[in-house]
């Protein structure tokens, strides 16, 4: 079993399937039957077992088996009758409040907080038994892992719903009970639905595209102090008329900089005097790229 290749293929296929929506876009969910689960704010890791050898890794083969050995041992025991399997799960920190991504990072780095870590499994990547539909996978996971979140490892609870019920569950789970979001899926599509948030950020630079006299994207940051700016991301989802207006303003503010940043199309950012603040709409802040490498 080629574990690394299987995980990368899975991540690529799942990433293409995911459709991110805000709660104002729930009507986009196509008609049909779905499985709904609460979205946990953690990190994606994979439990991999080949013959008698097992480990917990991510798509870059970073291995945390020794850090969360108790979770691995529990999974080894629960899956003792399974020879080859790869499970996808969300590593999260179980607390009285809503779990946070930062708590997961802290738990991996601080031994005293590690006891709070849990692996909530939500999918079967590969198994000895052919499991073609999510319904079959979920039954397998419930039977072998159970749904008790007090266990170190468990299957994330899913419920079957109609598309017309998504908004009702969003209000109950996310708005009322402060969950990060919802995952709504069937065998054709996976929707990630979250509350839309806004952030006021400095425009720190821009790139140019093939169209003259308009920007392609902007880089964004926040002041740490009077002399330092923290880069927090980039944005290219900008209306055409605003691209033209920003071009006129930003080229006048261009400055020389020792800091370099390359856009996804390979062009270098031009940096400017940090004088313009803009409001950005977003669904989430990410610390990692889709390949699990940290965003720098």
Q: How would you label these PLM feature ranges?
A:
Residues 1-10, 154-198, 245-252, 260-262:
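Amphipathic alpha-helical
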Residues 2-31, 36:
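Charged, flexible boundary elements
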Residues 26-149, 277-294:
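Covalent nucleotidyltransferase
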Residues 27-30, 37-41, 175-176, 195-198, ...:
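A short catalytic or substrate-binding loop motif that flags glycine-/basic-rich loops and adjacent residues
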Residues 43-50, 202-210, 214-225, 234:
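Catalytic nucleophile-His microenvironment captured as a short glycine-rich beta-strand/loop
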Residues 181-185, 265-289:
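Short, active-site-adjacent segments that bind or coordinate small-molecule cofactors and metal centers
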Residues 193-202, 271-275:
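Short coil-to-beta-strand transition motifs
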Residues 228-264, 269-274, 292:
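A short-motif feature that recognizes glycine-rich, charge-decorated loops
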């Amino acid at each position: 079993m080629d574990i690394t290749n299987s995980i990368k293929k899975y991540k690529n296929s799942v990433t293409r399937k995911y459709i991110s929506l805000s709660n104002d876009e729930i009507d986009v969910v196509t008609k049909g039957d779905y499985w709904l689960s609460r979205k946990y704010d953690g990190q994606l890791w994979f439990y991999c077992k080949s013959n008698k050898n097992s480990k917990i890794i991510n798509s870059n083969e970073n291995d945390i088996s020794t850090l969360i050995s108790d979770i691995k041992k529990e999974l080894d025991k629960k899956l003792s009758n399974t020879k080859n399997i790869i499970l996808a799960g969300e590593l999260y920190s179980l607390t009285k409040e809503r779990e946070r991504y930062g708590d997961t990072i802290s738990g991996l780095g601080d031994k005293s907080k590690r006891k709070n870590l849990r692996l909530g499994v939500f999918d079967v990547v590969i198994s000895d038994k052919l499991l073609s539909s999510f319904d079959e996978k979920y039954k397998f996971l419930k039977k072998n892992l159970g749904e008790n979140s007090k266990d170190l490892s468990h299957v994330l609870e899913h419920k079957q719903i109609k598309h017309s019920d998504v908004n009702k569950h969003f209000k109950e789970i996310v708005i009322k009970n402060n969950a990060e979001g919802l995952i709504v899926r069937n065998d054709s599509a996976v929707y990630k639905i979250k509350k839309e948030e806004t952030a006021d950020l400095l425009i720190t630079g821009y790139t140019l595209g093939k169209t003259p006299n308009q920007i392609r994207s902007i880089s964004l940051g926040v002041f740490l102090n009077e002399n330092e700016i923290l880069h927090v991301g980039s944005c290219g989802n900008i209306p055409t008329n605003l691209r033209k207006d920003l071009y006129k303003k930003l080229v006048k503010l261009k400055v020389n900089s020792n800091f370099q940043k390359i856009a996804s199309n390979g062009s270098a950012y031009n940096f400017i005097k940090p004088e313009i603040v803009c409001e950005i709409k977003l669904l989430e802040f990410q610390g990692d790229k889709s390949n699990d490498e940290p965003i720098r």
